[in-house]
A protein has these predicted regions:
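Helix-coil boundary/capping segments in enzymes
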Residues: 1-235
Length: 235
């Protein structure tokens, strides 16, 4: 799968916006420099708002960005640990970014499930063996699992728990992803594996891929103010 693996490409961004709880973007030769993650037919841009550290609040906007524009602590482990020292942060849970998305939806939604599973396993291997390794527990690994099959999800929980991972990310509202709700029994193998391995289940706001809003033309502030309502709906 090496030739189909996710990769970063620099492509000008002609448009980027966030209105009515919907994120929109497009490429264009006359646009601003932007780094994009490409995966199969997907192009997902890097944005200032998701790498806001170090910028004045007035500059934290929904605009394109590149890795050179970001503070190195966003992607470089020694720099991250140094930033944590500066901020007096002892440890942090490492959620996925907007490319794999908050519970790994990107890999779970790809039509080729063999490729999706390979990406999930590779992501978890990187998380455990590279990003969080040799940090004295300060960077806490958070695994993702294949959401299309609860038995496969359970197997991935067991695989990572065997090497000390004790946290998994899950969707706040799986029904919004077109998956069975937590009330159906569908997820029982996954939850049973978590319980048996003493793995805690974590849910990031927005992990249902649906952001609340009041109208199609509502400004970003409206969706931001209502975002925490998703957590209230997670049961």
């Amino acid at each position: 799968f090496r030739d189909r693996a996710p990769r970063v490409e620099r492509i000008p961004c002609a448009h980027m916006g966030y209105v009515g709880g919907v994120f929109s973007f497009s490429t264009g030769e006359e646009g601003e420099p932007c780094d994009w993650w490409r995966f199969e037919d997907l192009l997902i841009p890097r944005t200032r708002v998701e790498s806001a550290v170090g910028f004045d609040r007035s500059a934290v906007t929904v605009t394109p960005t590149t890795y050179e524009d970001m503070r190195p602590g966003c992607y470089d482990k020694p720099s991250r640990l140094a930033d944590m020292d500066a901020g007096r942060i002892e440890a942090m849970m490492c959620y996925p970014s907007s490319f794999p998305r908050f519970c790994g939806q990107t890999f779970s939604e790809t039509p080729d499930k063999e490729l999706g599973l390979a990406c999930i396993e590779a992501y978890n291997n990187w998380m455990v063996e590279e990003w969080c390794a040799d940090t004295g527990g300060r960077l806490i690994p958070l695994m993702i699992v294949p959401l299309w099959d609860p038995e496969l999800a359970a197997a991935e929980v067991r695989r990572n728990a065997a090497r000390g991972v004790r946290a998994v990310t899950f969707s706040e509202i799986p029904a919004y992803l077109g998956l069975p709700s937590i009330h159906t029994g569908y997820w029982d193998p996954f939850f049973a594996a978590c319980e048996a391995a003493d793995v805690s289940v974590h849910m990031h706001i927005g992990s249902s891929s649906k952001m609340p809003s009041t109208s199609a033309d509502a400004p970003p502030l409206v969706a931001s103010a209502l975002t925490f309502g998703n957590a209230m709906s997670s049961m």
